[in-house]
From Swiss-Prot:
Its main location: membrane. It is found in: Cell inner membrane. One of its GO terms (cellular component) is plasma membrane. GO terms for biological process: cell division; cell wall organization; peptidoglycan biosynthetic process; regulation of cell shape. PANTHER family: PHOSPHO-N-ACETYLMURAMOYL-PENTAPEPTIDE-TRANSFERASE (PTHR22926), PHOSPHO-N-ACETYLMURAMOYL-PENTAPEPTIDE-TRANSFERASE HOMOLOG (PTHR22926:SF5). Its cofactor is Mg(2+). Pathway: Cell wall biogenesis; peptidoglycan biosynthesis. InterPro entries: Glycosyl_transferase_4, PNAcMuramoyl-5peptid_Trfase, PNAcMuramoyl-5peptid_Trfase_CS. This is Phospho-N-acetylmuramoyl-pentapeptide-transferase. Keywords: Cell cycle, Cell division, Cell inner membrane, Cell membrane, Cell shape, Cell wall biogenesis/degradation, Magnesium, Membrane, Metal-binding, Peptidoglycan synthesis, Transferase, Transmembrane, Transmembrane helix. Pfam families: Glycos_transf_4, MraY_sig1. It comes from Zymomonas mobilis subsp. mobilis (strain ATCC 31821 / ZM4 / CP4). GO terms for molecular function: metal ion binding; phospho-N-acetylmuramoyl-pentapeptide-transferase activity; UDP-N-acetylmuramoyl-L-alanyl-D-glutamyl-meso-2,6-diaminopimelyl-D-alanyl-D-alanine:undecaprenyl-phosphate transferase activity. It is a multi-pass membrane protein.
Length: 356
């Protein structure tokens, strides 16, 4: 909204700052942060009243988690509302990349909300069928890929390598959709401890703030030897809003959590990160920056596959964070150490921009 005002004749001098992406990114972060902090307590109180029993706790999980019974879920709604309002105020509505990310964020958020609602109302940990959920997720992801790939760039870029490796052509669509859906569900699997998924999402968003900015800037992109995507710089406003809303949510999600993110938030934020990676053509770098999410997802895949084949478990419990809990690590220890790993991986991912 403010961007449109700044573009209007007669307001150019008064609102000149709004033309700058960096200013709008900071403003979006502060706006989302304030919305979350101010309205968070009321939102949590409302959720406590209407959810009664709160988030169902798995019987086969760590026994220490049973003490969390009654904690409300669907906290991702708070994040989505804060991000959406912030984007409405600060984004450029004419940018197709932002709309692709919003479509995934809200679409996956709806899927997660339905899943959370089903769990809460049925007092069950099962939720929506996995096949049904994946079907809708891939449908939304392919739509986002259609919006993003109108420029026709279907080339694949690798870290530490200067220039494109291969033109995937039509195969880029399923590849990109897999990145989006895979990231969403990986973040969803990571969201198992208080604050565990929130900070890595914030860290990954910070990394892709940098990536989006340099990819959208022709001078920086040419200097670094990375793909230049005109208009991708606008995605920094989205990353700023996610960072601000994420910190606001973490204020209430820090141990002991007053509210859980739920599938509403984890699917939406993970899908949005995947879409940003596709839009900036840094899909493989996302695998480095979001290496924690990849490790969590792989631990589940390995555990299930190995057990089906050999009737033995590789990990004491999956996802990976539960394995370390079973080794005797306290929940805060697991969370903080995973945060440190996430930060280190983000630095490594950013290093690939220069080391080519």
């Amino acid at each position: 909204m403010f961007y449109l005002i700044a573009s209007a004749e007669g307001f150019s001098r008064l609102f000149n700052l709004i033309r700058y992406i960096t200013f709008r990114t900071g403003a979006a972060a502060i706006t989302a942060l304030l919305i979350g902090l101010i309205f968070g307590p009321r939102f949590i109180g409302w959720m406590r009243i209407h959810q009664h029993k709160g988030q169902p706790i798995r019987d086969d999980g760590p026994k220490t988690h049973l003490a969390k019974a009654g904690t409300p879920t669907m906290g991702g709604l708070m994040i989505l509302i804060a991000v959406s309002i912030s984007l409405f105020l600060w984004m450029d509505f004419a940018n197709p990349y932002v709309w692709a990310c919003i479509a995934v964020m809200l679409g996956f958020g709806v899927i997660g909300f339905i899943d959370d609602y089903d769990k809460v109302t049925q007092n069950s940990t099962r939720g929506v069928s996995g096949k049904v959920r994946l079907l809708w997720e891939f449908g939304i992801a392919f739509f986002a890929c259609y919006l993003i790939l109108k420029d026709g760039n279907t080339q694949l870029y690798l870290p530490f390598y200067n220039g494109p490796v291969i033109d995937l052509g039509w195969f880029y669509y399923p590849f990109a959709a897999f990145v989006i859906v895979g990231t969403a569900n990986s973040v969803n699997l990571t969201d198992g401890l208080d604050g565990l998924a929130t900070m890595p999402v914030i860290i990954a968003s910070l990394a892709f703030f940098v990536i989006s900015y340099v990819v959208g800037n022709a001078v920086f992109a040419h200097y670094l030897g990375i793909p230049h995507v005109p208009g991708a710089g606008e995605l920094t406003i989205l990353t700023g809003a996610i960072i601000g809303a994420g910190f606001a949510f973490l204020w209430f999600n820090a141990p002991p959590a007053a509210i859980f993110m739920g599938d509403t938030g984890s699917l939406a934020l993970g899908g949005c990160l995947g879409t940003i990676a596709v839009a900036t053509h840094h899909e493989i770098v996302l695998g480095i920056v979001g290496g924690l999410f990849v490790a969590e997802a792989l631990s589940v895949i390995i555990q299930v596959g190995f057990y089906k084949r050999f009737k033995r478990r590789v990990f004491r419990m999956a996802p990976l964070h539960h394995h370390f809990e079973q080794l005797g690590w306290s929940e805060p220890t697991v969370v903080i150490r995973f945060w440190i790993i996430s930060f280190a991986l983000a630095l490594l991912g950013l290093a690939t921009l220069k080391l080519r």
